[in-house]
Regions:
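Alpha/beta-hydrolase fold nucleophile elbow
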Residues: 103-113
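Active-site signature of alpha/beta-hydrolase-fold catalytic machinery across serine-
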Residues: 37, 123-127
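C-terminal catalytic histidine-bearing segment of alpha/beta-hydrolase fold enzymes
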Residues: 175-217
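A conserved short beta-strand
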Residues: 130-142
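Gly/Ala-rich beta-loop-alpha elbow adjacent to hydrolase catalytic centers
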Residues: 113-117, 121
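Serine-hydrolase catalytic machinery in alpha/beta-hydrolase-like enzymes
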Residues: 2-104
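Short beta-strand/loop motif that positions the catalytic acidic residue
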Residues: 159-162, 166
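Short alpha-helix in the alpha/beta-hydrolase fold that links the catalytic acid
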Residues: 36-40, 170-180
Length: 217
């Protein structure tokens, strides 16, 4: 199977037709292979799940060997939002392709990601009318709370995780997102990792796995 975004795909270890899917979006300057390491760990415990880890559609302005979902360099908030909407369309298209090619419904699909991939997953999942199952977010934030508040179309379950020492996307962004989803009556789980910078710790990987098991199995 091929998708509109170049993707690292990990097929179910059961060698059966997938019963569900997890789409993981990498961070700024990364690629699908980077975040597929997380999927490789989860895969052993989720043997009927297909994992799709796409490369973002643009070469990264700050890291020519990596990719970006949208440009963050010298951009105004309005420009960032505008460019994120283009990436959102591409991620929505990928979700539809994963549904079609694997004969799944949206409620059998979880999306998520790290940093910029988390930002895009939150925006896409909340605005999508065909409700996905859940969203897993590591070290991210809401791109534009005003835009998102005016475009809520579904309420997937959410887990947000963040390091308290993150200097790239600060803990304030996590707290803002937590407050936004609480005010808008989302079912949300959160976890702050102590002495953790901008990364996914082992505990975060384990919590993500538990979240998927609970919601897809």
């Amino acid at each position: 199977m091929s998708y509109s975004l170049n993707s690292t795909v990990l097929k179910p270890l059961s060698n059966k037709k997938p019963e569900n899917a997890v789409i993981l979006c990498h961070g700024y300057g990364g690629d699908g292979k980077d975040i597929s390491l997380l999927a490789s760990y989860w895969r052993a415990y989720l043997q009927d799940t297909v994992f799709i880890c796409p490369d973002a559609p643009e070469k990264c302005a700050a890291s020519p060997t990596g990719f970006q979902w949208f440009d963050l360099m010298d951009q105004s908030q309005e420009q960032i939002l505008s460019k994120s909407l283009v990436a959102e369309k591409k991620l929505n298209d990928l979700i539809d392709e994963v549904k079609l090619q694997n004969n799944l419904v949206a409620n059998q699909i979880i999306i998520g990601g790290f940093s910029q991939g988390c930002m895009l997953s939150l925006q896409t999942g909340i605005k999508r009318k065909d409700k996905i199952n859940s969203i897993i977010g590591y070290s991210g934030k809401i791109i534009d709370t005003d835009h998102l508040s005016k475009n809520i179309n579904s309420r997937p379950k959410i887990i947000l995780m963040h390091g308290d020492s993150d200097q790239v996307v600060t803990i304030d962004a996590f707290l803002e997102a937590k407050d936004f989803f609480a005010k808008n009556k989302y079912i949300i789980e959160t976890k702050i990792f102590e002495n953790c910078e901008h990364r996914i710790p082992t505990e975060g990987s384990s919590l993500g796995l538990q979240f998927i098991k609970k919601n897809l199995y």
